[in-house]
């Protein structure tokens, strides 16, 4: 059911992306900037924005610019993240910097970042609410950068605690889903308690989503549209790895950059055998349950129920 709702709302998002984010001159820059947008994706963040607007009893079309702005920010972060991580694949296509070069990819990300705020400013809402929304999205972008820096700095350290990992994930992934869920409450001038509850729904959903994403990196071989096992090879301190290290597990391929499939499979088996994978799954589920509890402040409706189902979907998807 929820997958059909996601597809339906994503269709609206894609149509608006076509309208607002056209290719233009200089062609080389905009081809790079639109590369991931054209590659598709589930559009989960803008779908959450539209469903949140509906759950608040508002016309979702009045939140469409905010939804596109958030998807544009998301794509800007992907372009820059892929440069830093040196990933070659994303969404089943070559990464922007691989195709267009690093200088153009940096400019493409910067362009998307600026376009996001331009699009948000077009929202059909009172000017003072738009200003608040712009301010909140700007703060989210700062926190995303902080989270990305934390993630990179963890790679240089021998050990990272679970609480540090969760704070990094809250910033790198959680806050963008937090603003996705709460920005309609800002634009429509809803009560602060409603805005806060939707923010928390998004934050907790985002943490659960990221933990599940880390799980997919070692279990979603051939499905996730990026390099399988790349987190291990890059030396990323995911919750799974943190737990495995606590259990005294040694991973031969961790942070090595390259390894044979056989070596990688041996290390991944260790993560399953020591209980680290099951532990991460349990933690992801806990965060999703916390997310859903925050929706209780909103009157029951089909759209609220869709948000509940979507939270479950975030940790049940296979890609």
Swiss-Prot record:
Pathway: Isoprenoid biosynthesis; geranyl diphosphate biosynthesis; geranyl diphosphate from dimethylallyl diphosphate and isopentenyl diphosphate: step 1/1; Isoprenoid biosynthesis; farnesyl diphosphate biosynthesis; farnesyl diphosphate from geranyl diphosphate and isopentenyl diphosphate: step 1/1; Isoprenoid biosynthesis; geranylgeranyl diphosphate biosynthesis; geranylgeranyl diphosphate from farnesyl diphosphate and isopentenyl diphosphate: step 1/1. Its EC number is 2.5.1.-, 2.5.1.1, 2.5.1.29, 2.5.1.10. Mg(2+) 1 binds at residues 81, 85. Mg(2+) 2 binds at residues 81, 85. GO terms for biological process: farnesyl diphosphate biosynthetic process; geranyl diphosphate biosynthetic process; geranylgeranyl diphosphate biosynthetic process. Belongs to the FPP/GGPP synthase family. It catalyses: isopentenyl diphosphate + dimethylallyl diphosphate = (2E)-geranyl diphosphate + diphosphate; isopentenyl diphosphate + (2E)-geranyl diphosphate = (2E,6E)-farnesyl diphosphate + diphosphate; isopentenyl diphosphate + (2E,6E)-farnesyl diphosphate = (2E,6E,10E)-geranylgeranyl diphosphate + diphosphate. This is Geranylgeranyl pyrophosphate synthase. Keywords: Isoprene biosynthesis, Magnesium, Metal-binding, Transferase. Binds 2 Mg(2+) ions per subunit. InterPro entries: Isoprenoid_synthase_dom_sf (IPR008949), Polyprenyl_synt (IPR000092), Polyprenyl_synt_CS (IPR033749). It is an enzyme of class 2 (transferase). Homodimer. Dimethylallyl diphosphate binds at residues 90, 172-173, 210, 226, 236. It comes from the Archaea. One of its GO terms (molecular function) is (2E,6E)-farnesyl diphosphate synthase activity. Transmembrane segments: none annotated. Isopentenyl diphosphate binds at residues 42, 45, 74, 91. Catalyzes the addition of 3 molecules of isopentenyl diphosphate (IPP) onto dimethylallyl diphosphate (DMAPP) to form geranylgeranyl pyrophosphate (GGPP). Catalyzes the synthesis of geranylgeranyl pyrophosphate as a major product and of farnesyl pyrophosphate in smaller amounts. Its cofactor is Mg(2+). It comes from Geoglobus acetivorans.
């Amino acid at each position: 059911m929820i997958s059909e709702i996601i597809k339906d709302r994503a269709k609206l998002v894609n149509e608006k992306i076509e309208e607002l984010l056209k290719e233009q001159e200089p062609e080389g820059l905009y081809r790079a900037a639109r590369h991931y947008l054209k590659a598709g994706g589930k559009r989960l963040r803008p779908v959450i924005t539209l469903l949140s607007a509906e759950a608040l009893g508002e016309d979702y079309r009045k939140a469409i610019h905010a939804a596109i702005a958030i998807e544009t920010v998301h794509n800007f972060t992907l372009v820059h993240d892929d440069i830093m991580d040196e990933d070659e694949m994303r969404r089943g296509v070559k990464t922007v910097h691989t195709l267009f070069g690093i200088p153009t990819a940096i400019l493409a990300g910067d362009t998307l970042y600026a376009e996001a705020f331009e699009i948000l400013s077009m929202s059909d809402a009172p000017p003072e609410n738009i200003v608040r929304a712009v301010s909140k999205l700007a703060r989210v972008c700062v926190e995303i950068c902080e989270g990305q820096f934390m993630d990179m700095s963890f790679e240089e350290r021998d050990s990272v605690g679970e609480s540090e990992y969760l704070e990094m994930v809250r910033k790198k992934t959680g806050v963008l889903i937090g603003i996705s869920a709460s920005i309609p409450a800002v634009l429509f001038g809803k009560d602060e308690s409603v805005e806060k509850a939707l923010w928390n729904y998004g934050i907790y959903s985002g943490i659960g989503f990221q933990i599940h994403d880390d799980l997919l990196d070692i279990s979603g071989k051939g499905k996730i549209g990026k390099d399988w096992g790349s987190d291990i090879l890059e030396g990323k301190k995911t919750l799974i790895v943190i737990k495995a290290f606590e259990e005294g597990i040694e991973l031969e391929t961790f942070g090595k950059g390259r390894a044979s499939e056989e070596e990688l499979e041996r290390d991944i088996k260790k993560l399953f055998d020591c209980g680290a994978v099951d532990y991460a799954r349990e933690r992801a589920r806990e965060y999703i349950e916390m997310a859903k509890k925050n929706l209780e402040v909103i009157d029951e409706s089909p759209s609220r129920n869709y948000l509940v189902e979507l939270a479950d979907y975030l940790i049940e998807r296979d890609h």
